[in-house]
């Protein structure tokens, strides 16, 4: 790199750090009232879990991996501690693959050294014109309301809020957001049953004790394997965003932060004709170098294959996964795959289903330095039963590759952008250059 380029990078880095610190110092903890629209729906049969930005339990807490608890119920109580965390995730992609949305609500003290607490909302929108909205918002307080018929949550501060509402049969979800850059919501209608990491259906009667574990320390529930999504939102500029597509909802919780859990992960949610696909691939750091998988394949919303077996078997259903490198688009970090090949197999039925996933749109990228980072894509998907009809569809994927340690100044740039408020999306491009 030339001296001029080095100087520009240094000046850019200095400006970014100054902006983050300035934004951090100007923020004060808030105590907004809980919005009225949910008060009308809960009663004494509901339980309420409240967590403010600075509620971190000192020492061991109650951590549940029970397969019988509702997927969206709170798993960690009374609060997260310095290491464990939980997340509620919802996503959707338009039928064209050009517009997409992802929302994740977290209670996570991993980055408590920022001084902004443990409540985050990660919010990504990709628009058909190629523009991207990236909201990483640190919030003042959160509530999760668990009622007989629904689970609801809200992460809010005085000038912005994000909320979700999911029925207990996991067939319907409603999400709303009111932030600095975008306001609106989306609905999700699913006809797939909720499932657990081992492929078993979720029921209140429970399943195997380890049914929720996708890899050591990481737990997973599939609330919606495939859902119709309807998005309606308005940007601060006045531009309206509407699209229909497919998506789903995933629940994650863990005993440790991501950097202690794994080297990285790859996640796919896709559809093609009557098929819906959800796949998780985690390279563990707890079991050094061991790869763990969880795959679900639905046909007309009924589960065909659900398995944590990631190698060929004569008896058990399994799923195989390989990266491909012969396409046109890859991420800008170390992992240069252009797509993936998935194979689901059922030896008992003597059937296999294969799907090729090819990146077509980069939805977001966040760097961690030295070629490490995270990339999200929209994808073209082609596949079906081997020897049968092949279908074409779309999907979303995310891939990460993390170092064992990220210097705090880099975390400040990546995650600390949540302090920058309205300007953070624009600064993301400079961060990508610096890292």
From Swiss-Prot:
Glycosylation sites recorded in the entry for this protein: 81, 156
Family: Belongs to the Diels-Alderase family.
InterPro entries: DA_C
Mutant lacking the gene: phenotype: Abolishes the production of xenoacremones A and B.
Record GO terms (molecular function): isomerase activity
Keywords of the record: Glycoprotein, Isomerase, Signal
Name of this chain's protein: Hexane cyclase xenF
Species this chain originates from: Xenoacremonium sinensis
Pathway: Mycotoxin biosynthesis
Signal sequence bounds: 1-23
Enzyme's top EC category: isomerase
Function (record text): Hexane cyclase; part of the gene cluster that mediates the biosynthesis of xenoacremones such as xenoacremone A, a compound that shows inhibitory activity toward the PI3K/AKT signaling pathway and which has the ability to induce apoptosis of A549 lung cancer cells. Within the pathway, cooperation of the hybrid PKS-NRPS xenE and the trans-acting enoyl reductase xenG is responsible for the formation of the reduced tyrosine-nonaketide derivative. The alpha/beta hydrolase xenA then accelerates intramolecular nucleophilic attack to give a pyrrolidone derivative.
Source superkingdom: Eukaryota
EC number(s) given by UniProt: 5.5.1.-
């Amino acid at each position: 790199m030339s001296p001029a380029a080095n100087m520009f990078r240094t000046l850019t880095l200095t400006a970014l750090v100054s902006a983050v610190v300035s934004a951090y110092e100007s923020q004060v903890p808030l105590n907004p009232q809980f919005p009225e629209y949910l008060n009308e729906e809960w009663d004494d049969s509901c339980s309420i879990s409240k967590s403010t930005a600075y509620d971190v339990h000192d020492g061991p807490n109650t951590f549940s991996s029970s397969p019988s608890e509702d997927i969206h119920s709170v798993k960690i109580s009374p609060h997260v501690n310095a290491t464990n965390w939980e997340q509620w995730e919802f996503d959707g992609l338009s039928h064209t693959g050009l517009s997409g949305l992802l929302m994740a609500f977290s209670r996570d003290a991993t980055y408590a050294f920022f001084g902004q607490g443990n409540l985050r909302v990660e919010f990504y929108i990709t628009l058909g014109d190629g523009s991207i909205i990236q909201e990483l918002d640190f919030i003042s307080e959160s509530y999760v309301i668990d009622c007989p018929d629904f689970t609801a949550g809200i992460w809010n501060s005085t000038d912005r809020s994000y909320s979700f509402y999911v029925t207990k049969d996991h067939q319907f979800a409603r999400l709303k957001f009111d932030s600095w850059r975008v306001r609106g919501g989306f609905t999700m209608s699913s006809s797939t049953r909720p499932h657990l990491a081992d492929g078993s259906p979720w029921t209140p009667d429970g399943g195997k004790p380890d049914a929720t574990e996708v890899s050591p320390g990481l737990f997973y529930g599939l609330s919606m394997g495939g859902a119709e999504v309807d998005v309606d939102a308005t940007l601060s500029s006045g531009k309206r965003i509407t699209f229909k597509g497919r998506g789903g909802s995933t629940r994650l919780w863990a005993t440790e932060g991501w950097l202690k859990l794994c080297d990285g992960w790859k996640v796919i949610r896709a559809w093609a004709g009557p098929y819906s696909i959800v796949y998780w691939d985690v390279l563990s750091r707890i079991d050094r170098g061991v790869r763990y998988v969880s795959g679900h394949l639905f046909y007309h919303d009924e589960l065909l294959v659900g398995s944590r077996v990631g190698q060929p078997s004569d008896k058990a259903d399994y799923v195989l996964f390989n990266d491909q490198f012969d396409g046109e688009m890859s991420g800008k970090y170390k992992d240069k795959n252009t797509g993936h090949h998935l194979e689901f197999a059922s030896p008992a039925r003597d059937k296999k289903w294969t799907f090729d996933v090819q990146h077509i749109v980069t939805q977001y990228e966040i760097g961690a330095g030295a070629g490490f980072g995270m990339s999200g894509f929209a994808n073209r998907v082609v596949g079906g039963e081997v020897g049968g009809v092949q279908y074409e569809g779309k999907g979303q994927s995310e891939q990460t590759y993390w170092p064992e340690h990220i210097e705090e100044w880099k975390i400040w740039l990546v995650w600390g952008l949540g302090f920058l408020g309205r300007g953070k999306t624009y600064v993301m491009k400079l961060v990508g250059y610096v890292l």
